[in-house]
From Swiss-Prot:
Source species of the chain: Naja melanoleuca
Keywords of the record: Calcium, Disulfide bond, Hydrolase, Lipid degradation, Lipid metabolism, Metal-binding, Secreted
Cofactor binding comment, as recorded: Binds 1 Ca(2+) ion.
Required cofactor(s): Ca(2+)
Physiological role: PLA2 catalyzes the calcium-dependent hydrolysis of the 2-acyl groups in 3-sn-phosphoglycerides.
Protein name as it appears in the record: Acidic phospholipase A2 DE-II
Length: 119
């Protein structure tokens, strides 16, 4: 769920607040469209698509589904024992949080003009 995703981000990117990723580029935060502005934005596009796939599992609501995962020390390696939906959502979040840690954060891509740059 989004709260657990926030915690994963804080684990993998401890030097930046999670909310810096909530309105970044064309895909981090609300919806998404157009071409990702950089690698970090591509992480969010992949995460959005991953949640879309998880939603195809009967009764799976990624934004609110809770799951178990191993506590972190800079990288997240395991999602623990979960049912199919929870495992899918956890893996979406784990992959994205680790992707965020590898990608460069460009301040110019925070809070961009969505209508002008993301069509």
């Amino acid at each position: 769920n989004l709260y657990q995703f926030k915690n994963m981000i804080q684990c993998t990117v401890p030097n930046r607040s999670w909310w810096h990723f909530a309105n970044y580029g064309c895909y981090c935060g609300r919806g998404g469209s157009g071409t990702p502005v950089d690698d970090l934005d591509r992480c969010c596009q992949i995460h959005d698509n991953c949640y879309g796939e998880a939603e195809k599992i009967s009764g799976c609501w990624p934004y609110i589904k809770t799951y178990t995962y191993e506590s972190c020390q800079g990288t997240l390696t395991s999602c623990g024992a979960n049912n199919k939906c929870a495992a899918s959502v956890c893996d979406c979040d784990r992959v994205a949080a680790n992707c965020f840690a590898r990608a460069t954060y460009n301040d110019k891509n925070y809070n961009i003009d969505f209508n002008a740059r993301c069509q």
